[in-house]
Amino acid sequence: MNQYDGKIKVSTLNSDMIRQINEIQRRNPNKKLYVEIPNTRGISSEMLRQLSPNISIRIEGAYDQERVSRLGDVKYDTGETGEYYTSAVIYTRNEAIRIISEMEKIEKGLEGQNFDQFEKVVYIYEKLKTGIMYDPKYEHKLSKDIRSLRGFITKQTVCAGYAVMFKEMMDRQGIECHYVSGVTNKGRRTCLEYCNN
């Protein structure tokens, strides 16, 4: 994992919290810090622009501490271990801005619609399916490239990336969604969404 000098864990970001984080960074200019948030619900790309460019952001999403600890002994062909999931979802401020900007573009299509939860799920699924290419060559890339939200930027991913991105989009909509994985010879990741309809 990249070496960080400290982590600031918060349940969400708002303008007041961003000011406090920037002040911590200002007082510790030689420290490499990251902010950890459970997901990006309620966070806009414009809000992140207020954050110091020196701060990185870990968006837990599918990789909360419980999952990371369960995967600690897993070893991938690339040599990565399950612990790598902690750093795979740490983004530079600029990466996070780009990722959220792409999610906001998808969400723009929901504005003015009277979609129920199921219709939102289908709409977002279709947008991810048509806007991001499944690339089997990506299976041999590092976790940070395929098991993260970076597919919103690269427009390429594999099943694990789709599931992570879909889960994040559901979190942003307040729709309960769980990242599901298992151990097989040919693993595939998927999300289960729960709709109240």
Where are these regions (language model features)?
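Periplasmic OmpA-like peptidoglycan-binding domain that tethers envelope proteins to the cell wall
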Residues: S148-A160
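Linear, non-domain "peripheral" regions
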Residues: M1-K108
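Solvent-exposed loop/turn segments at secondary-structure junctions
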Residues: T40-G42, T130-D135, E139, T157-C159, ...
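Secondary-structure boundary elements
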Residues: R93-G151
